[in-house]
């Protein structure tokens, strides 16, 4: 990514500035993402507009992802074998707003995060949300009461299932803070 490829961040909120160089996400395949994106659109259009269905697996990048950094990340990810991701009934908390699918196996996501954060693009302090368990958000910009109501509404009708994780996506926000795919990293040694 060249400097001219970076978005004009002058209109962004302070918390959005951290994401200037992007983030690494697990993006579910289209047949999984489509019904989850429909829920995101219905219950939290703001989140849906920012990014489609995903599972966050990295801190925001600390610097631009140049060719050397891409090679470094790809080499690190060769050590992580692809795995099956399970997602079940959405959950909500009485302590903080949001509705999300818990995903498993959490140990594989922890391994993925550990390996990713060895890269030089994450040098510096650990981002405050690094230790949050991996999950797939349905809605986040709402109240606790709305979260609990939505979760109850979705309990028996939200899709659930599994999908194969064999790749990660580098996504970067544009000037309107809408994330765009910029690159793909394959997991494991079989390419």
Regions flagged by a language model, labelled:
Residues 1-191:
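Histidine-dependent nucleotide/RNA phosphoesterase domain, centered on the 2H-phosphoesterase fold
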């Amino acid at each position: 990514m060249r400097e001219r490829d970076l978005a004009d961040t002058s209109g962004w909120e302070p918390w959005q500035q951290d994401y200037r160089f992007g983030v690494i996400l697990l993006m579910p395949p289209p047949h999984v993402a489509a019904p989850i994106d429909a829920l995101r659109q219905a219950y939290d259009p703001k989140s849906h507009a920012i990014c489609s269905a995903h599972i966050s697996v990295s801190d925001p990048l600390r610097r631009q992802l140049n060719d050397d950094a891409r090679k470094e990340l790809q080499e690190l990810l060769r050590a992580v074998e692809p795995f099956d991701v399970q997602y079940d009934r959405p959950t909500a908390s009485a302590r903080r707003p949001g509705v999300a699918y818990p995903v498993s196996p959490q140990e594989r996501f922890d391994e993925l995060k550990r390996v990713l954060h060895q890269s030089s693009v994450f040098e510096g302090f650990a981002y405050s949300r690094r230790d949050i368990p991996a999950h797939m958000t349905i809605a986040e910009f709402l109240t606790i009461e709305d979260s609990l109501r939505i979760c109850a509404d979705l309990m028996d009708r939200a899709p659930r299932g599994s999908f194969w994780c064999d790749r990660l996506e580098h996504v970067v926000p544009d000037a309107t803070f809408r994330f765009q795919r910029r690159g793909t990293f394959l997991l494991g040694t079989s390419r």
